[in-house]
């Protein structure tokens, strides 16, 4: 095959005639290719040279050309596949994607009068002022990347992630963190905050992004936006309106424009005047639209939080210097840490963020099992809680929501529930038309189901479909779960096409590990004591997926009153409680961390009174159905303490 590239390097115009040498020779697994270089030198004389170019681990090719020691240009061809992630850093090459002309045109519309090259310089200058990210040695890096399981990443997935779309459009050097269009004031604020002199000053909370007045966002669709993208935006808006106090009004005179540019990006917060949100080709995903709208509402990426180093390790080993400013961490003065750190947030980078081709991951979670969960595009329960807290959404009456849910400000008669739970008070199994309630025994039982849509075999759908199972077991038993086999799963960072999430931990509000890679099959996972029922939440947005998994219960040696969450989580919750910034009430804390909180044998309530958390009618039914004794004692006490008799005999 012949391909033609034109490269302008300094004084040279180099015409590259790409020749695949000796196609029938498969030595060294066809790792090397020959390139025939034809060019004119500085004196206008034609010259010619043939060079052998090594193939990189990701399928791309690396070449370097030097002219009189003044020119050093490195380019990588677009890779045709991805590879198994490795434990050490292989030879890498930065992907070089120049800003395309169409991307430049749409970017000019969004930059509010700032020339693209000036914005590029501003971001580069801001990056030089960023707080030093602790550098880790090669030995430390190798150890870090041995902490999590390596998987075979799916080759040629059905769609690119939004950050890959922007990278290939050449937008990375012109947008902050790959998709944020900062204004001059925000750049100045971040630069000031990152300087060592400013960091020594005690500062008050200073939001980088302004709120939308009246909690109303006015917008209109640019004439070039397709009906498909318009519907995707409407779907994202409908979801956000149904779960927050925010309102979006379509108005042709609005200055906030959603347009079909090149790439996926937006402004952050309410800026005043014309604002833009770009959803170009490759951005036709409901989660991507919601992600960019969330930026418009004032949210930054999760890994920018001031406390991020408690949850992830940043490894810049294979991140080009020009991209390292994207790993800026905010200070407590500007970081909005309103909910627990959420690995599965739709605002979190994946572990591959800004990594050179073939390099090691740039973000590694302290909880290694979460490495392939980061980078998801499903709006999580805590994402919704973050938005509602950020905009002070509330209801006149607070409902007694179960399983960590909270009153829905868009409909104060129901709760917003963690995935896996539904009903008015989050006490029922969410029915998506797929899934059922299963009863575990002490022997393995198997469940197989297929869901999705066979009509989209060529590309991924804009939105996912869900399936939800509950596994129940007798009181005092612990549920075990094992994935046996899968069909048509795409193993990618973020599990953006399909995945299964067994909710094993007692805190149902957080996104738990999602599995979309076969390397985790056959592993026996044990739920925390007291997790009963245990939801198994699964999703699909490409073709059809089949899951086969097994479940059973085992005896537990955990006492009735004990921590049901891991020690690190309980110590963190205890610290937050002591500092007066806990998002949980005393009853919730007892269910999760009774021993650490020293709540065993004590009435768990903020005001010292013992009462049912749910309405009397529901607790009466709860007791009649035998749930006071069938459920784990801590769970029964939490739900209906008075009706179940725990006021006189606390767990």
UniProtKB/Swiss-Prot annotation:
Active site: 292
Cofactor binding annotation: Binds 1 zinc ion per subunit.
Tissue specificity comment: Expressed in pharyngeal, anal depressor, intestinal and vulva muscles, head neurons and head mesodermal cell.
Necessary cofactors: Zn(2+)
Cited Gene3D superfamilies: Collagenase (Catalytic Domain)
Disulfide bonds: 245-393, 264-283, 395-412, 415-426, 434-467, 495-516, 610-647, 619-640, 628-644
Protein location: Secreted
One GO molecular-function entry: zinc ion binding
One Pfam family matching this protein: Astacin
Stretches assigned to the CUB domain: 434-554
Domain ShKT: 610-647
Enzyme class, UniProt record, top EC level: hydrolase
Keyword Signal recorded: yes
E.C. numbers: 3.4.24.-
Keyword field contains Manganese: no
One of the GO biological process terms: proteolysis
Positions annotated with a glycan in the UniProt record: 25, 72, 251, 411, 453, 557
GO cellular component: extracellular region
Keyword terms: Cleavage on pair of basic residues, Disulfide bond, EGF-like domain, Glycoprotein, Hydrolase, Metal-binding, Metalloprotease, Protease, Secreted, Signal, Zinc, Zymogen
Domain EGF-like: 380-433
Role according to the record: Metalloprotease.
Protein name: Zinc metalloproteinase nas-32
